[in-house]
Every structure is written in structure tokens, then in C-alpha cells.
Amino acid sequence: MLKKLKCKKDMSQIVVGLDIGTTKIACFVGKKNEHGKIEILSMGKSESLGVMRGMVANIEKTVQSIRTAVQEAQSRVDGELTIRVVNVGIAGQHIKSLQHRGIYTRNAFEDEISQKDIDALIEDMYKLVMQPGEEIITVLPQEYIIDSEQGIKDPIGMAGRRLEANFHIITGHVGAVLNINKCVQKAGLEVKDIILEPIASAESVLSDEEKEAGVVLVDIGGGTTDVAIFHEGIIRHTAVIPFGGNV
């Protein structure tokens, strides 16, 4: 039996994922446990009637499929739950990735590097100029360089003046992202975050040891195939191939 939500304060620990696929739309409801891991409370799914190769082709049909999946997920929770905010997975043939190095010069090298410094470096990546019609969806740090010292995975607390980082940047078509947002909003939901599906799949099934040793994840869906490559614990490449099990 699914675990019952004990009280209202538990709602702050609820996480909802929405997978808008070519053949089905799935809604997962999870709750963070005392170890910070996600326990699945319920799942709902519906036939995907308005999506082709990971991209929305019919707004109204996609909205109806989303509503059906969300309502089913809500009904299967042992306790009252109203889903309002979702994390949406994104894929589709419009998704691309690129590598870029960012540089952030700090005012005082003797001060410890903080999360604020890292956030400033990441924020600069979102200001990169993309091709017309494309936008940056996600910026993933790979490794950091402090005053020419390379291979640093966590620079917080270290000293240095010049902070650099190699980034894996995910881009997508503005129209495709807007259509996903529009479908979710018309279904009465709010988008908390948009997550690249190969990354979400990797976090679900790959261990830290596998990522460190080197691994390729291949997720064959109905209309697309997602690929993610890890080595030394770092995301090296992602891709969405516009062919799947039904194509």
C-alpha cells in the first residue's frame, strides 16, 4: 500500500515529475525521506495523443493527456493531495548541447570561494548569445579551475582570484519550450523546473561508481532515444536522437 501523507507539513517534501513523451504521459509523485532520497508515492499515466518525437504537435490533446495522468496520480495517493507544481522532463529533436568555459575574476583572492561566486559564474553562462530561436535550458558545471589549477570538482572553501569552469550547456527551441509550458499551464499546473530527460534518467538509474568509471546511458522511448555519457563522475555529452521504438 502507498504510504499515507501524515500531515500538511509533509507537503513541503512532495516532489512531482511530469514526463511528456511521444507514446505516453506519466506523472510521478514522490516524497523526500529522512536520507534525502525520493520515495515514489504514486504514478499516473495516459496515452500521449498530441506529441510527436518529443515535441508538442497538438496543444489541446496534450493538455487532456496531462490532466488524465495527473488526476490518476492524485487518486492513487493514500491521503488528500492536490498537485499544483510539477518538474517537467524535456526531450525532442530540437535539443542540442555544447561545451563552454566561463571565467569569473574575484576581488580578493584571500577570501574563500563561496556558493555566491559559483552562482555568478553559472549566471554568466545563461547570458551567452544563442542562434535565433534557441534558448539555454540548463547549465551543468563539469569541473572548475582555480588560478590555473585544474580538475577541481568542488571549489567552495578554497582560495583563489581567478575562478573558471567548464560547462555542459543544454539548448532548445524557444517555441518548443513555450509549447510545453503552455500545455502544463492550461492543465492548471505550474512549472517549477524543466529538466533534460537524459539527465533525469541518469540520476534515477546510475550509481556514483558507474559515473566515475565511465558509462553511457541509452533510453529508447517511443519517439526519441536519449543519450547521456559520464566519465570521472562528470557529464560529458548528452543527445536526443529523433528515432525511437515506434519510429
Residue ranges and their predicted role:
Residues T22, G221-T224:
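Short, glycine/acidic-enriched loop or turn micro-motifs at the edges of active sites
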Residues D226-A228:
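A structural feature that tracks compact, well-ordered secondary-structure segments
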Residues M1-K24, F28-L217, I234-T238, G245:
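Nucleotide/phosphate-binding catalytic cleft detector across ATP-hydrolyzing
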Residues H231:
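A cytosolic small-molecule/anion-sensing beta-strand core signal
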